[in-house]
């Protein structure tokens, strides 16, 4: 373990002032109104294009927000945001940039890595995505037997699975109904067999996504898919690989390969060729809308002052809850489609589930929270009881669609937020007492379009990055995952010898 004389973030002036504010809040914990006495002219909602952010139910006031912004300034958050987007090598353990933002940059600026402009490769790959998706949608991409494609199967795991799943599920009103979409990520044979039972191999396209092209689960399922065809000559039109190591895909017999690069983390690959299945499903023009939504959040986070910066405010209020109010369970409840929570779980916990800071020291403060949740209407019959009267304190992000304002689903969400924030006190029934005071954000999306989904995903990406800066950890590596892979390889080699 590296030890040096650099200050811990808990020694910063703003951190200690925030600790004093937290002590005062705890003394007045019986009522949210006790937390916000200086609320005159205090704005508790912000908006950018398709997303409104309401944090009026958070246990913060103007003083606390100002101190959180002071903390952001003390750790040079603006400089770190600029470094992220401009391609500095901020992934220090792997000595490379984390340039997922470049994937959705639709402008003409150059972004340099080691003297090379990467944008030409990004634009070239986008053009390949356009050509492939158009050919398949126009029935011009034919299988080995001359039949057009009817089924697309995405084989991948982690970021190569969850991002595409979110899109196909959330954008159901936009996807072409002329195709069937399937996902294989598990090595459980039943998972593979369930998909294969639904398809005709002669009209199926498999997209095999693996950044390293050594991911055991993905390659195992890819080889099983290969076995559906008579010989290697017949697989050419049925397999596309997405990888940072095209030579490994060629070696395996896949001729059509789209690149991803080592400067894109798997869990941040939402806007890359990993999401080819979505470009096919919604069409390339709508796929560009998804990129545009994400890019507009990139611009917002880089050029908006912190008091009006939605990802920054979400990050800072999350720090307040996690590090000063000691609430380490982060619920995400939403009223549109599935898979968003699993996606954010991986994005957040794999990025910020760290206890070693960028200087190689054990931290002396809490880092990434436990992220959980699910569909809001199902919460009523699962974990809502725990939120109301349980002993574990939680914070929540509740996400609703403005287009559902006239529907029961939104009124139920508003009722839940009211009960959880205000509580219920009844003298007649002491068993019905609900303390309330659960801190929560409310994100109101204008719709569930590709543009809005791209913006929502980018919002969480930036929130997570900005929290990593406050915690002084690297969100772009995953040594725990890598060590588990190494241990598995050693066990496999030992059993084979």
Curated annotation (Swiss-Prot):
According to UniProt, the name of this protein is Glucose-6-phosphate isomerase
Q: Which Gene3D superfamilies match?
A: Glucose-6-phosphate isomerase like protein, domain 1
| Function text | Catalyzes the reversible isomerization of glucose-6-phosphate to fructose-6-phosphate.
Listed transmembrane segments: none
Top EC category? isomerase
Q: Where in the cell?
A: Cytoplasm
Family of this protein: Belongs to the GPI family.
Pathway(s) it belongs to: Carbohydrate biosynthesis; gluconeogenesis; Carbohydrate degradation; glycolysis; D-glyceraldehyde 3-phosphate and glycerone phosphate from D-glucose: step 2/4
Signal sequence, start to end: none
Q: Which gene encodes it?
A: pgi
Residues forming the catalytic site: 350, 381, 485
């Amino acid at each position: 373990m590296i030890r040096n004389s650099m200050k811990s973030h808990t020694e910063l002036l703003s951190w200690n002032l925030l600790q004093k504010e937290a002590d005062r809040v705890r003394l007045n914990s019986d009522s949210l109104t006790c937390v916000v006495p200086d609320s005159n002219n205090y704005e508790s909602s912000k908006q950018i294009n398709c997303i409104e952010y309401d944090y009026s139910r958070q246990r913060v006031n103007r003083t606390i927000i100002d101190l959180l912004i002071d903390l952001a300034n003390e750790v040079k958050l603006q400089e770190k945001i600029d470094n992220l987007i401009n391609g500095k090598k901020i992934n220090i353990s792997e000595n490379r940039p984390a340039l997922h933002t470049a994937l959705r940059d639709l402008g003409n600026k150059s972004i340099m890595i080691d003297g090379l402009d990467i944008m030409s490769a990004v634009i070239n790959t986008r053009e390949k995505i356009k050509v492939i998706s158009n050919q398949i949608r126009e029935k011009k991409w034919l299988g080995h037997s001359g039949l057009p494609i009817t089924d697309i199967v995405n084989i991948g795991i982690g970021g190569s699975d969850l991002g595409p799943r979110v899109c196909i599920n959330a954008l159901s009103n936009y996807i072409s109904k002329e195709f069937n979409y399937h996902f294989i990520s598990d090595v459980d044979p039943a998972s593979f067999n369930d998909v294969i039972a639904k398809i005709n191999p002669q009209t199926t396209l498999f997209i095999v996504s693996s950044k390293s092209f050594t991911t055991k689960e993905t390659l195992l399922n890819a080889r099983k898919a290969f076995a559906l065809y008579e010989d290697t000559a017949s697989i050419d039109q049925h397999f596309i690989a997405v990888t940072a190591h095209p030579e490994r895909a060629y070696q395996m017999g896949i001729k059509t390969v789209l690149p991803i690069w080592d400067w894109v983390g798997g869990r941040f690959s939402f806007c890359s060729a990993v999401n080819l299945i979505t470009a096919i499903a919604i069409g390339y023009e709508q796929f560009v809308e998804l990129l545009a939504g994400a890019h507009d959040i990139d611009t917002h986070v880089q050029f908006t002052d912190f008091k009006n910066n939605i990802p920054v405010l979400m990050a800072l209020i999350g720090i307040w809850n996690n590090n000063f109010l000691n609430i380490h369970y982060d619920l995400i409840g939403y009223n549109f489609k599935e898979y968003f929570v699993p996606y954010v779980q991986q994005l957040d916990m794999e990025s910020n589930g760290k206890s070693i800071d960028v200087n190689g020291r054990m931290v002396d403060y809490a880092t990434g929270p436990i992220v959980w949740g699910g569909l809001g209407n199902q919460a009523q019959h699962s974990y809502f009881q725990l939120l109301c009267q349980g002993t574990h304190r939680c914070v929540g992000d509740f996400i609703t669609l403005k287009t559902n304002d006239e529907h029961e689903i939104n009124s139920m969400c508003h009722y839940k937020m009211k009960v959880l924030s205000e509580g219920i006190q009844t003298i007649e029934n002491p068993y019905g007492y609900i303390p309330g005071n659960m801190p929560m954000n409310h994100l109101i999306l204008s719709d569930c379009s590709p543009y809005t989904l791209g913006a929502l995903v980018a919002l969480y990406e930036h929130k997570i990055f900005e929290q990593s800066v406050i915690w002084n950890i690297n969100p772009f590596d995953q040594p725990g995952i890598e060590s588990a892979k190494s241990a598995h390889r050693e066990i496999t080699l030992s059993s084979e010898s």
